[in-house]
């Protein structure tokens, strides 16, 4: 028997040829889902200083913090159906850092993100993708660059991509709590960059 998750993915694949979802301005009661890992949880900052909490204050909308520390793209994909059941009107996908740290096959990360976008579209919800740095030993020295798979997937899937945000923040020692996590100021700056990006899309 086909599972609910597989049905959502299949529906999204069939819809993928319809092109990028049209973005509309979120109503006052609409929620945003922030899907991710420890960067979404806000690891390294006090409670309430995570980027979803700061984003909620900036845009006056409810933001569901769908982050779990240590999550890989496969684990985030497995959690996504339950998060979509909360009926968000926009999903921000910021995932993949733990895949890179664990040196998981890039092909698996790509496929998991494809499935996430397909599942989100099957729920008739627009998605935006956030580029994640390719964490290597260079990150310990403050040399941070984005993994190229995000730009490639954004082009392939026709999904808006926020570039440069995490790489800029995690490349600045004043905005980090450790080599791969932001501090309060870093999460605030990410939220500000995301707000600017969403405004350009006409979402907020």
Indicate where each model-derived feature is located:
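N-terminal secretory signal peptides
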Residues: 1-2
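N-terminal export signals
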Residues: 6-20
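Serine-esterase "nucleophile elbow" of acetyl-processing enzymes
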Residues: 19-87
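Alpha-helical cap/lid subdomain in secreted, periplasmic
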Residues: 58, 77-204
């Amino acid at each position: 028997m086909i599972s609910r998750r597989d049905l959502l993915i299949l529906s999204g694949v069939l819809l993928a040829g319809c092109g990028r979802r049209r973005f509309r301005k979120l109503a006052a009661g609409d929620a945003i889902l922030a899907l991710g890992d420890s960067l979404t949880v806000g690891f390294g900052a006090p409670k309430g200083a995570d980027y979803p909490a700061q984003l909620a204050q900036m845009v006056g909308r409810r933001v569901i913090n769908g982050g779990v520390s240590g999550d890989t793209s496969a684990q985030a994909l497995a959690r996504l159906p339950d998060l979509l059941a909360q009926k968000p009107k926009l999903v921000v996908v910021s995932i993949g850092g733990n895949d890179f740290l664990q040196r998981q096959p890039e092909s698996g990360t790509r496929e998991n993100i494809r499935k996430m976008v397909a599942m989100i579209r099957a729920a008739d919800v627009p998605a935006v993708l956030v580029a994640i740095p390719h964490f290597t030993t260079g990150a310990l020295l403050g040399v941070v660059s984005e993994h190229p798979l995000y730009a490639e997937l954004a082009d392939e899937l026709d999904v808006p991509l926020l570039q440069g945000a995490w790489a800029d923040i995690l490349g600045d020692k004043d905005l980090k709590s450790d080599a791969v996590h932001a501090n309060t100021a870093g999460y605030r700056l990410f939220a500000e960059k995301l707000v600017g990006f969403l405004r350009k899309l006409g979402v907020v």
